[in-house]
A protein has these predicted regions:
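Catalytic phosphate/metal-binding cores of nucleic-acid and nucleotide-processing enzymes, i.e., regions
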Residues: 1-114
């Protein structure tokens, strides 16, 4: 299930003109690294694919905190709709729907599934 979800996430990002890279374990990775790193309309997004009954590890929670503190978006993707809604929020911000009156785009931070 998790592999199928990750494949669908990658396809969704590609279909909407974004970039993604899959993080593979190995010598240069560390515990907690997200499954997918993406860039969509200039936003850095770290995505951790999760099964419906999965829960994040302590290392994954640390990674989430680091990404958010650095100004990126972190998603625990329990389903494709979580990723789709995050991309929709980015589109709304970039297309003028997220203007907070300051002239800056509204910040998006952590978006998490159910």
């Amino acid at each position: 299930m998790e592999a199928d979800l990750k494949r669908k996430i990658k396809r969704l990002i590609e279909d909407r003109g974004g970039f993604w890279s899959a993080v593979k374990g190995g010598e240069y990775s560390k515990p907690g690294d997200p499954d997918i790193i993406a860039c969509y309309r200039g936003y850095f997004i770290a995505i951790e694919g999760k099964s419906a009954d999965g829960s994040p590890s302590e290392e994954q929670e640390d990674c989430r905190e680091w990404v958010v503190d650095a100004g990126g978006i972190h998603i625990y993707a329990y389903n494709l709709d979580v990723v789709r809604s995050t991309l929709d929020l980015i589109d709304a911000c970039e297309d003028g729907g997220g203007d907070d009156g300051s002239g800056r785009r509204s910040p998006l931070r952590h978006h998490e599934g159910p």
